[in-house]
A protein has these predicted regions:
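Nudix hydrolase/Nudix homology domain
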Residues: 2-28, 97-110, 142-211
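Short N-terminal binding/cap micro-motifs at the start of the first secondary-structure element
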Residues: 29-34
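Acidic, metal-coordinating catalytic segment for phosphate/diphosphate chemistry
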Residues: 35-80, 86-90
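Conserved aromatic-histidine-acidic binding/catalytic patches
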Residues: 61-65, 110-114, 118, 148, ...
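Residue-level detector of short, conserved catalytic/binding motifs and their immediate flanks
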Residues: 69-71, 118, 158
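Conserved Nudix-box catalytic region and its N-terminal flanking loop in Nudix hydrolases
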Residues: 80-124, 128
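A short coil-to-beta-strand element that immediately follows conserved catalytic motifs
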Residues: 133-142
Protein backbone atom coordinates (compact mmCIF):
# COMPACT_ATOMS: atom_id res chain seq x y z
CA UNK A 1 0.00 0.00 0.00
CA UNK A 2 1.46 3.37 -0.98
CA UNK A 3 1.85 6.20 1.51
CA UNK A 4 -0.88 8.08 -0.34
CA UNK A 5 -3.39 5.23 -0.26
CA UNK A 6 -6.38 5.72 1.98
CA UNK A 7 -7.67 2.97 4.25
CA UNK A 8 -11.08 2.60 5.83
CA UNK A 9 -11.50 2.69 9.63
CA UNK A 10 -11.94 -1.09 9.55
CA UNK A 11 -8.63 -1.61 7.73
CA UNK A 12 -6.77 0.73 10.07
CA UNK A 13 -8.19 -1.07 13.08
CA UNK A 14 -7.20 -4.50 11.75
CA UNK A 15 -3.65 -3.32 11.22
CA UNK A 16 -3.22 -2.25 14.83
CA UNK A 17 -5.77 -3.86 17.10
CA UNK A 18 -5.74 -6.81 19.45
CA UNK A 19 -7.89 -9.86 18.76
CA UNK A 20 -11.56 -9.01 18.45
CA UNK A 21 -14.73 -9.63 16.48
CA UNK A 22 -16.33 -7.31 13.96
CA UNK A 23 -19.54 -5.68 15.15
CA UNK A 24 -21.84 -2.88 14.09
CA UNK A 25 -24.02 -0.68 16.33
CA UNK A 26 -27.73 -1.43 16.23
CA UNK A 27 -28.41 2.24 15.62
CA UNK A 28 -26.89 1.69 12.16
CA UNK A 29 -28.30 -1.78 11.54
CA UNK A 30 -31.98 -1.39 12.37
CA UNK A 31 -32.86 1.40 9.89
CA UNK A 32 -31.16 -0.56 7.08
CA UNK A 33 -32.55 -3.96 8.10
CA UNK A 34 -35.98 -3.26 9.63
CA UNK A 35 -37.30 -6.82 9.19
CA UNK A 36 -35.89 -10.22 10.04
CA UNK A 37 -34.67 -10.73 6.43
CA UNK A 38 -33.60 -7.97 4.06
CA UNK A 39 -32.89 -8.86 0.44
CA UNK A 40 -31.26 -5.54 -0.41
CA UNK A 41 -27.93 -6.27 1.25
CA UNK A 42 -25.62 -3.69 -0.32
CA UNK A 43 -26.48 -0.77 2.04
CA UNK A 44 -25.68 -2.78 5.17
CA UNK A 45 -22.59 -4.27 3.54
CA UNK A 46 -21.31 -0.77 2.78
CA UNK A 47 -22.08 0.35 6.33
CA UNK A 48 -20.14 -2.58 7.75
CA UNK A 49 -17.09 -1.86 5.61
CA UNK A 50 -17.05 1.81 6.56
CA UNK A 51 -18.38 1.90 10.13
CA UNK A 52 -17.86 -1.46 11.84
CA UNK A 53 -15.89 -1.77 15.06
CA UNK A 54 -13.92 -4.62 16.61
CA UNK A 55 -14.62 -5.53 20.21
CA UNK A 56 -13.66 -8.39 22.49
CA UNK A 57 -15.93 -11.34 21.85
CA UNK A 58 -16.74 -11.91 25.52
CA UNK A 59 -17.95 -8.32 25.79
CA UNK A 60 -19.78 -8.44 22.47
CA UNK A 61 -21.83 -11.43 23.64
CA UNK A 62 -23.26 -9.30 26.45
CA UNK A 63 -23.55 -5.91 24.75
CA UNK A 64 -26.91 -5.60 23.02
CA UNK A 65 -25.99 -2.22 21.56
CA UNK A 66 -23.99 -4.12 18.93
CA UNK A 67 -24.45 -7.08 16.63
CA UNK A 68 -21.50 -9.26 15.64
CA UNK A 69 -21.14 -9.79 11.89
CA UNK A 70 -21.54 -13.43 10.82
CA UNK A 71 -21.16 -14.63 7.21
CA UNK A 72 -23.68 -17.49 6.79
CA UNK A 73 -22.89 -19.55 3.68
CA UNK A 74 -25.67 -21.73 2.23
CA UNK A 75 -24.49 -24.42 -0.21
CA UNK A 76 -26.60 -25.54 -3.17
CA UNK A 77 -26.14 -28.23 -5.83
CA UNK A 78 -28.91 -28.53 -8.43
CA UNK A 79 -32.11 -28.44 -6.35
CA UNK A 80 -30.53 -29.72 -3.15
CA UNK A 81 -29.06 -27.78 -0.26
CA UNK A 82 -26.49 -28.85 2.33
CA UNK A 83 -28.26 -29.66 5.59
CA UNK A 84 -25.98 -29.62 8.61
CA UNK A 85 -26.54 -31.09 12.05
CA UNK A 86 -24.37 -29.74 14.83
CA UNK A 87 -22.99 -32.19 17.40
CA UNK A 88 -22.44 -31.54 21.13
CA UNK A 89 -18.72 -31.07 20.32
CA UNK A 90 -19.49 -27.96 18.29
CA UNK A 91 -18.44 -24.79 20.12
CA UNK A 92 -21.72 -22.87 20.36
CA UNK A 93 -23.68 -24.68 23.08
CA UNK A 94 -26.90 -22.88 22.19
CA UNK A 95 -26.91 -24.65 18.81
CA UNK A 96 -26.08 -28.23 19.84
CA UNK A 97 -28.11 -30.91 18.00
CA UNK A 98 -29.83 -28.27 15.87
CA UNK A 99 -30.08 -28.51 12.10
CA UNK A 100 -28.50 -25.69 10.13
CA UNK A 101 -28.39 -24.54 6.52
CA UNK A 102 -25.32 -22.36 6.80
CA UNK A 103 -21.61 -22.47 7.52
CA UNK A 104 -19.90 -19.45 8.96
CA UNK A 105 -18.51 -17.56 11.89
CA UNK A 106 -17.11 -14.29 13.11
CA UNK A 107 -15.06 -11.79 11.15
CA UNK A 108 -11.99 -11.13 13.26
CA UNK A 109 -8.56 -9.57 13.25
CA UNK A 110 -6.76 -12.40 11.49
CA UNK A 111 -8.64 -11.56 8.30
CA UNK A 112 -6.78 -9.52 5.71
CA UNK A 113 -6.69 -5.75 6.06
CA UNK A 114 -6.33 -5.38 2.30
CA UNK A 115 -9.36 -5.69 0.04
CA UNK A 116 -12.81 -6.84 1.13
CA UNK A 117 -12.58 -8.06 4.70
CA UNK A 118 -16.08 -9.56 4.51
CA UNK A 119 -15.17 -11.70 1.51
CA UNK A 120 -11.90 -12.74 3.15
CA UNK A 121 -13.56 -13.66 6.43
CA UNK A 122 -16.35 -15.53 4.67
CA UNK A 123 -13.85 -17.59 2.68
CA UNK A 124 -11.74 -18.33 5.74
CA UNK A 125 -14.74 -19.59 7.71
CA UNK A 126 -15.93 -21.72 4.80
CA UNK A 127 -12.50 -23.26 4.20
CA UNK A 128 -12.05 -24.06 7.89
CA UNK A 129 -15.20 -26.17 7.93
CA UNK A 130 -15.71 -27.57 4.45
CA UNK A 131 -13.90 -28.04 1.16
CA UNK A 132 -16.12 -27.55 -1.88
CA UNK A 133 -14.74 -29.65 -4.72
CA UNK A 134 -16.10 -27.56 -7.61
CA UNK A 135 -17.63 -24.15 -6.97
CA UNK A 136 -19.76 -22.38 -9.56
CA UNK A 137 -20.69 -19.04 -8.00
CA UNK A 138 -21.15 -17.29 -4.67
CA UNK A 139 -23.28 -14.22 -4.00
CA UNK A 140 -24.71 -12.25 -1.10
CA UNK A 141 -28.49 -12.80 -1.12
CA UNK A 142 -29.70 -11.13 2.07
CA UNK A 143 -29.24 -10.11 5.68
CA UNK A 144 -30.72 -11.69 8.82
CA UNK A 145 -31.58 -9.28 11.64
CA UNK A 146 -33.67 -11.28 14.08
CA UNK A 147 -34.08 -10.98 17.85
CA UNK A 148 -36.23 -14.04 18.46
CA UNK A 149 -33.57 -16.02 20.35
CA UNK A 150 -30.90 -14.91 22.79
CA UNK A 151 -28.11 -15.93 20.41
CA UNK A 152 -29.68 -13.86 17.63
CA UNK A 153 -29.82 -10.64 19.64
CA UNK A 154 -26.07 -10.14 19.32
CA UNK A 155 -25.48 -11.46 15.78
CA UNK A 156 -26.21 -10.16 12.27
CA UNK A 157 -26.17 -12.71 9.45
CA UNK A 158 -24.87 -11.99 5.96
CA UNK A 159 -26.41 -14.79 3.88
CA UNK A 160 -24.32 -16.02 0.95
CA UNK A 161 -25.58 -18.60 -1.54
CA UNK A 162 -22.75 -20.74 -2.91
CA UNK A 163 -23.69 -22.95 -5.86
CA UNK A 164 -21.62 -26.06 -6.54
CA UNK A 165 -20.98 -27.65 -9.95
CA UNK A 166 -20.78 -31.11 -8.41
CA UNK A 167 -22.04 -32.60 -5.13
CA UNK A 168 -18.55 -33.41 -3.90
CA UNK A 169 -17.36 -31.84 -0.64
CA UNK A 170 -15.09 -32.67 2.28
CA UNK A 171 -16.22 -32.13 5.87
CA UNK A 172 -13.16 -30.72 7.64
CA UNK A 173 -14.79 -30.89 11.11
CA UNK A 174 -16.63 -34.23 11.26
CA UNK A 175 -16.54 -34.15 15.05
CA UNK A 176 -18.50 -30.87 15.04
CA UNK A 177 -21.22 -31.60 12.51
CA UNK A 178 -22.64 -33.98 9.93
CA UNK A 179 -23.82 -32.80 6.50
CA UNK A 180 -25.73 -34.15 3.50
CA UNK A 181 -27.57 -32.81 0.46
CA UNK A 182 -31.34 -32.55 0.90
CA UNK A 183 -34.27 -31.35 -1.20
CA UNK A 184 -36.51 -28.51 0.03
CA UNK A 185 -39.18 -31.07 0.98
CA UNK A 186 -36.67 -33.11 2.98
CA UNK A 187 -35.52 -29.97 4.76
CA UNK A 188 -39.12 -29.06 5.56
CA UNK A 189 -39.47 -32.37 7.39
CA UNK A 190 -36.98 -31.23 10.07
CA UNK A 191 -38.06 -27.58 10.13
CA UNK A 192 -38.97 -27.59 13.83
CA UNK A 193 -35.51 -28.93 14.72
CA UNK A 194 -33.68 -26.21 12.83
CA UNK A 195 -31.88 -23.24 14.37
CA UNK A 196 -33.67 -19.92 13.93
CA UNK A 197 -31.46 -18.61 11.11
CA UNK A 198 -31.93 -21.83 9.16
CA UNK A 199 -35.69 -21.45 9.45
CA UNK A 200 -35.45 -17.93 8.06
CA UNK A 201 -33.21 -19.06 5.19
CA UNK A 202 -35.57 -21.91 4.37
CA UNK A 203 -38.59 -19.60 4.27
CA UNK A 204 -36.95 -16.63 2.55
CA UNK A 205 -34.35 -18.21 0.23
CA UNK A 206 -35.08 -21.90 -0.37
CA UNK A 207 -38.82 -22.54 -0.26
CA UNK A 208 -39.76 -20.05 -2.96
CA UNK A 209 -36.57 -20.31 -5.01
CA UNK A 210 -37.26 -20.97 -8.72
CA UNK A 211 -36.28 -24.44 -9.95
Amino acid sequence: MSSESKTTPVQNWVLNAKEGVMALPRTIIDPLCPTRFTREAEPIRAAILSRAEFIERSKAEQDFRYKQIIPYIVLQHARKFLLIRRTPKQGETRLHDKFSLGIGGHINTIDKAEGDILETGMRRELNEEIKVHREEACRLVGVINDDTKEVDRVHLGLVYLLTCKTPGFTNREPEAYTALWQTPDEIAAVFEQMESWAKIVYEEVIRNKPA
